[in-house]
């Protein structure tokens, strides 16, 4: 095997590799010999399977493993020539060229190493911003939202017709072709009018009804309705309205304050207002950071700091962006790209600049996190993945395993580090100083 290594810049090197067919064949045979001692095959006793039988059945898998082993050996040889260690590598070696002829393999690999980055003066790049203000009106609106969560429907005493936003207590029975259908009947059912819980047209048909009124409401089941025997069918619901209910919002008394401020010894309207003010401010700040500040800061960092980028990582990121973009391409565009290598390469190259920015920012974020001592431990990582699973109704353990299989855990961890980092950077200085002062007092 021939291996020639060449350093391209501070973080990239190439490894020209030539693997003779005889070496591949020899490695395949070695693997087959090892496998013959443990593989189970009908007609042969354990440990007595002939090498020829193993080769015949598993030649493809053995060849793949052999080539993988030889390339690992080639990479190690290249690292020795470059006077580098394997722990200095970032990402997998990237195949820039791979040819197979008469059993011989000729390949060009890109080996990439982590860049050394100095972020002197990065603080000057942090965008200036005003800590969001919170008005009394916003606090009152947030209080109303909280109280509405504890609201319960109560029957109205005044005489009026049913309107959107009311809760209706009623009986109903549905008919298709003058025949009642299973699951289409209920008594004293309570429904929020306008919630769109029922099929289209039903709730609109109830608007304007009076207490005690009976009415036939004509509707059509959606074509994609879950029950196939009803999908797309016209139906009539016989409805009798018993009660109109309105949400009764509870008073903000001592009992309610204890519910809204669990664990708070001195639960009061003032304490609640202060907590809501802080919550609203943080929500506004979170939006400001994500919509504006984060992008401005990232652009400034990318423009300010220049360093060699690991080519292999950039190529992998370019491939990933290209694959992701395929979902947005038209069928015609996809066919054109498949038919022309030149067009495919041209399209792929259009993602290169964005890929370079993404990779550059990732390394900058990583270095910034170290400077500011931002870390994400395994427990935080698992909690974030479990939370995501619960949010989308998925099995958390399976969701975690999928991330592991895809090798995506480092990307998730990096996203969490980035979130923590920007929260640390953009936390209001007043809040930081208040916390520092409080800690100093406690220490005393």
From Swiss-Prot:
InterPro entries: PPIase_dom_sf (IPR046357), PPIase_FKBP_dom (IPR001179), Trig_fac (IPR005215), Trigger_fac_C (IPR008880), Trigger_fac_C_sf (IPR037041), Trigger_fac_ribosome-bd_bac (IPR008881), Trigger_fac_ribosome-bd_sf (IPR036611), Trigger_fact/SurA_dom_sf (IPR027304). SUPFAM superfamilies: FKBP-like, Triger factor/SurA peptide-binding domain-like, Trigger factor ribosome-binding domain. Its EC number is 5.2.1.8. It catalyses: [protein]-peptidylproline (omega=180) = [protein]-peptidylproline (omega=0). It is an enzyme of class 5 (isomerase). Its main location: cytoplasm. One of its GO terms (biological process) is protein transport. It is found in: Cytoplasm. Residues 165-250 form the PPIase FKBP-type domain. GO terms for molecular function: peptidyl-prolyl cis-trans isomerase activity. Gene3D superfamilies: 3.10.50.40, Trigger factor ribosome-binding domain (3.30.70.1050), Trigger factor, C-terminal domain (1.10.3120.10). Pfam families: FKBP_C, Trigger_C, Trigger_N. One of its GO terms (cellular component) is cytoplasm. Keywords: Cell cycle, Cell division, Chaperone, Cytoplasm, Isomerase, Rotamase. Belongs to the FKBP-type PPIase family. Tig subfamily. Consists of 3 domains; the N-terminus binds the ribosome, the middle domain has PPIase activity, while the C-terminus has intrinsic chaperone activity on its own. Involved in protein export. Acts as a chaperone by maintaining the newly synthesized protein in an open conformation. Functions as a peptidyl-prolyl cis-trans isomerase. This is Trigger factor. It comes from Campylobacter jejuni subsp. jejuni serotype O:6 (strain 81116 / NCTC 11828). The lineage of its organism: Bacteria, Pseudomonadati, Campylobacterota, Epsilonproteobacteria, Campylobacterales.
């Amino acid at each position: 095997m021939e291996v020639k290594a060449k350093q391209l810049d501070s973080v990239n090197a190439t490894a020209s590799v030539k693997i003779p067919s005889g070496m591949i064949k020899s490695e395949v045979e070695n693997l087959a010999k090892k496998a013959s001692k443990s593989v189970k095959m009908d007609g042969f006793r354990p440990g007595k399977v002939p090498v020829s039988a193993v080769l015949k059945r598993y030649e493809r898998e053995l060849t793949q493993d052999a080539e993988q082993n030889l390339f690992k050996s080639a990479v190690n040889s290249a690292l020795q020539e470059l006077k580098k260690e394997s722990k200095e590598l970032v990402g997998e070696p990237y195949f820039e060229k791979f040819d197979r002829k008469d059993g011989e393999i000729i390949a060009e690999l890109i080996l990439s190493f982590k860049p050394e980055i100095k972020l002197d003066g990065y603080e000057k790049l942090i965008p200036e911003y005003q800590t969001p203000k919170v008005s009394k009106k916003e606090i009152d609106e947030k209080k109303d939202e909280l109280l509405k969560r504890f609201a319960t429907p109560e029957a109205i005493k005044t005489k009026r017709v049913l309107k959107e936003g009311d809760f209706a207590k009623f009986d109903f029975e549905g008919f298709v072709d003058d025949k009642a259908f299973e699951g289409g009947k209920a008594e004293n059912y309570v429904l929020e009018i306008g919630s769109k819980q029922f099929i289209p047209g039903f709730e609109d048909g109830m608007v304007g009804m009076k207490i005690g009124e009976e009415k036939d409401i004509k509707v059509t089941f959606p074509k994609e309705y879950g029950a196939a025997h009803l999908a797309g069918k016209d139906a009539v619901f016989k409805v009798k309205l018993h009660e109109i209910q309105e949400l009764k919002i509870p008073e903000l008394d001592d009992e309610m304050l204890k519910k809204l401020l669990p664990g708070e010894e001195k639960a009061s309207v003032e304490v609640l207002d202060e907590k809501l003010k802080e919550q609203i401010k943080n929500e506004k700040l979170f939006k400001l950071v994500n919509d504006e500040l984060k992008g401005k800061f990232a652009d400034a960092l990318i423009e300010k700091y220049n360093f060699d980028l690991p080519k292999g990582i950039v190529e992998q990121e370019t491939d990933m962006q290209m694959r992701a973009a395929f979902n947005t391409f038209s069928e015609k565009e996809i066919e054109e790209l498949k038919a022309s290598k030149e067009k495919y390469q041209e399209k792929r190259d259009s993602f290169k600049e964005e890929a370079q920015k993404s990779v550059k920012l990732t390394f900058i974020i990583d270095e910034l996190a170290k400077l500011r001592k931002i870390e994400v431990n395994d427990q935080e990582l698992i909690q974030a993945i479990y939370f995501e699973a619960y949010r989308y109704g998925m099995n958390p353990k399976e969701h975690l395993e999928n991330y592991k299989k895809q090798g995506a855990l480092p990307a998730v961890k990096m996203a969490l580090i980035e979130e923590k980092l920007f929260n640390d950077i953009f936390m209001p200085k007043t809040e930081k100083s208040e916390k520092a002062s409080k800690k100093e007092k406690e220490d005393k």
